Amino acid sequence: MGYKISIDAMGGDNGLNTTIPAALEAVKKDSNLQIVLVGDHHKVKRALDRYSKVKKIKLPVLQRIAIHHASETVGMDESPSIAVRKKKDSSMRVAINLVKDGTVDACVSAGNTGALMATSKFVLKTVNGVDRPAIVYALPAFNRDTKQLSKTYMLDLGANVVCSSEQLFQFAIMGSILAASSKGLAEPRVSLLNIGEEEMKGLDNIKNASKLLQGCDFINYQGYIEGKHIFDDTTDVIVCDGFVGNVSLKTMEGSLRLIESLIKKSITETSLLMKIPVIMSLPLFKKMKKGMNLDSFNGASLLGLTGIVVKSHGSASANAFETAIYEAVKEIKHNIPKTIQESLEKVL
């Protein structure tokens, strides 16, 4: 079965220098994939010609890539309201419009998160039973028993700063459906992020959401999870409001940079004798870094919409953006919006 994805070719910090090579690699590796590059036709065509020559892409592959002109671009610091009201011919808006009219099956963008969420909600609307869409991201998790690296889905990561207990309940259902489809699990484990594991701890909306989840047979609810256990692979879905989720995600990113800086500092400031064991450990560090390659975790889904929209990190590399494309493919295959709709109808 073939599938088609629109790409906001102009979006993100690096624009065409990221989206074009990623699109070429994706269609080269997946013969069922077609891509529509949305953006300034002249600029997109020029970049496509250049990168296709560099990568030696053959004609049959190039024939599965089309260009759809859009005269405007949404800036990374642009107001979401301006993007929705005034940038009606932006590469982001047009790419999402193609999802709405059925021309493509999904959209991928590395553009402004707020603008992408606002535009997606305005154009596609939410499925019945969902008040507001949520941003979900797959985090790396390490199972101490099997010694295997896995994924834990976390939502919301910034779309909704304040959430009611009902909205957290909806997020749990959507996250469970995504985890079941992506990880092949019959009953994904779902947990609420809280300041402690005891039932009396936390804000009222979290405690009330916990009661709703306890009474839902559809959800394999595990109770509360603390921040220190996010990476322990003790759950498959972590639910929180967008404020807590966004702060948590950015703290994780900062922690990784700190660890990398400390390793570099220890190498440069130690004596020659002390550098020997550090140098001998470099292959181990490289292996560890490869296992924790964040490129393989890129691609945040905007869950709860009637169509599929995947958000790539704004500063993503071509490899990372390619991963976001594959995330969209996965959601197309499992028809995530329809599955969410059907599941909500059963429990609400």
Swiss-Prot record:
Q: What's the Enzyme Commission number for this chain?
A: 2.3.1.274
What keyword terms does UniProt attach to this protein? Cytoplasm, Lipid biosynthesis, Lipid metabolism, Phospholipid biosynthesis, Phospholipid metabolism, Transferase
Q: Pathway it acts in?
A: Lipid metabolism; phospholipid metabolism
Which terms in the Gene Ontology molecular function aspect does this entry carry? phosphate:acyl-[acyl carrier protein] acyltransferase activity
Which reaction equation describes what this protein catalyses? a fatty acyl-[ACP] + phosphate = an acyl phosphate + holo-[ACP]
Q: List the disulfide bonds.
A: none
Q: Does the keyword Cell membrane apply?
A: no
Please state where this protein is localized.
Cytoplasm
Give the matching InterPro entries.
Answer: FA_synthesis (IPR003664), Phospholipid_synth_PlsX-like (IPR012281)
The GO cellular component terms are:
cytoplasm
Tell me one GO biological process term: phospholipid biosynthetic process
State the source organism's domain of life: Bacteria
Q: Which HAMAP family match?
A: PlsX
Task: Fetch the PANTHER family from UniProt.
Answer: FATTY ACID/PHOSPHOLIPID SYNTHESIS PROTEIN PLSX, PHOSPHATE ACYLTRANSFERASE
Which NCBIfam families does the UniProt entry name for this protein?
plsX (TIGR00182)
**What function is annotated for this protein?**
Catalyzes the reversible formation of acyl-phosphate (acyl-PO(4)) from acyl-[acyl-carrier-protein] (acyl-ACP). This enzyme utilizes acyl-ACP as fatty acyl donor, but not acyl-CoA.
Tell me which family the UniProt entry assigns to this protein.
Belongs to the PlsX family.
Q: How does it assemble?
A: Homodimer. Probably interacts with PlsY.
Question: What is the designated name of this protein?
Answer: Phosphate acyltransferase
Q: Which gene encodes it?
A: plsX
